[in-house]
Amino acid sequence: MPELPEVEVVRRGVARWVVGRTVSSARFLHPRVTRRHVAGPDDAGARTRGLVVADAVRRGKYLWLPLATPDGRAEEAMVVHLGMSGQLLVEAADAPEEKHLRAVWTFDDGGEDLRFVDQRTFGGIAVVPLVATPDGGPGGLGETPDGSWSGSMPAPVAHIARDPLDPAFDDAVFARRLRERTTGLKRALLDQTLVSGVGNIYADEALWRAKLHYARPTRSVTPAQAAALLAGLREVMTAALDAGGTSFDSLYVNVNGASGYFDRSLAVYGQEGRPCPRCGALVRRDAFMNRSSFSCPVCQPVPRSPHW
């Protein structure tokens, strides 16, 4: 599933090619694409037609497009769930349809279409109300911080925490809330109500950078270690963004269909049996929450009282 860097790559592409354009039509080609929009596909289409895509905003792994009236007011947004394999692509109107095309939006300027392609159909869209953010800050990272919608976010996303690349992220609050938990460190990182945007790949990479074992009890994490962990998250996510994200297959692409290449720079994730780039010990893989955790047995020793 795409994590923060992959979604941010898509957000930037949508911001460049779609923001500021007026939707003229919406066509949904698979019933699952609007399953999160309770009123159905016809209603989803009607609530976008004639409105301007005012911005492309991201918080963690969540992406939404505020929909504004001609006077600039945005009371709703289209939330895009990429799921396991969702892709937002900008294509010429006469380009051949992709095999797994699920939705198409056209615009009144007659330019390129926005297409949603999803092989596994776990993704989808929903048009939902915007609500004020719980902390009064910006909803997420967008292109127009002074827009009328900037202090709001989609109602279904309101419980999601800020992500480490969000300028409004509070490091001290994160460290305090982390120590209040009674769980393992990686489990906490995957909890989107504590910190958003972190999935299996970047959790493993950040823990390696901070020299912390994934099963370390959160209550034992010192402020200095929490700071090192956040630094690791920001470092690996920024590097992944520069590389266009991590692509292990053709499913994670930007709006022009190009895959990222950060998978070539991973230190431990997916590197079982290969030498740790820091100490040379062989990277190990452990079963973890129906997935895998990768770590260095020397740089990231198992704590005395692990919380598996």
From Swiss-Prot:
InterPro entries the record matches: DNA_glyclase/AP_lyase_DNA-bd, Formamido-pyr_DNA_Glyclase, FPG_cat, MutM-like_N-ter, Ribosomal_uS13-like_H2TH, Znf_DNA_glyclase/AP_lyase, Znf_FPG/IleRS
Which SUPFAM superfamilies does this entry report, sorted A to Z? Glucocorticoid receptor-like (DNA-binding domain), N-terminal domain of MutM-like DNA repair proteins, S13-like H2TH domain
**CDD domains recorded:** EcFpg-like_N
The processes (GO biological process) annotated in the record are: base-excision repair
Q: Which UniProt keywords apply?
A: DNA damage, DNA repair, DNA-binding, Glycosidase, Hydrolase, Lyase, Metal-binding, Multifunctional enzyme, Zinc, Zinc-finger
Q: How is the cofactor bound?
A: Binds 1 zinc ion per subunit.
Q: Where are the zinc fingers (FPG-type)?
A: 267-301
Q: What residues form the catalytic site here?
A: P2 (schiff-base intermediate with dna), E3 (proton donor), K61 (proton donor), R291 (proton donor)
Q: What is its EC number?
A: 3.2.2.23, 4.2.99.18
Record-level Gene Ontology MF annotations: 8-oxo-7,8-dihydroguanine DNA N-glycosylase activity; class I DNA-(apurinic or apyrimidinic site) endonuclease activity; damaged DNA binding; zinc ion binding
Q: Does the keyword Transmembrane apply?
A: no
Enzymatic reactions? Hydrolysis of DNA containing ring-opened 7-methylguanine residues, releasing 2,6-diamino-4-hydroxy-5-(N-methyl)formamidopyrimidine; 2'-deoxyribonucleotide-(2'-deoxyribose 5'-phosphate)-2'-deoxyribonucleotide-DNA = a 3'-end 2'-deoxyribonucleotide-(2,3-dehydro-2,3-deoxyribose 5'-phosphate)-DNA + a 5'-end 5'-phospho-2'-deoxyribonucleoside-DNA + H(+)
Q: Required cofactors, per record?
A: Zn(2+)
Which sites bind DNA?
A: H100, R120, R181
Q: How does it assemble?
A: Monomer.
Family, per the entry? Belongs to the FPG family.
Q: What does this protein do?
A: Involved in base excision repair of DNA damaged by oxidation or by mutagenic agents. Acts as a DNA glycosylase that recognizes and removes damaged bases. Has a preference for oxidized purines, such as 7,8-dihydro-8-oxoguanine (8-oxoG). Has AP (apurinic/apyrimidinic) lyase activity and introduces nicks in the DNA strand. Cleaves the DNA backbone by beta-delta elimination to generate a single-strand break at the site of the removed base with both 3'- and 5'-phosphates.
Q: Any idea what this protein is called?
A: Formamidopyrimidine-DNA glycosylase
| Biological classification of the source | Bacteria, Bacillati, Actinomycetota, Actinomycetes, Kineosporiales
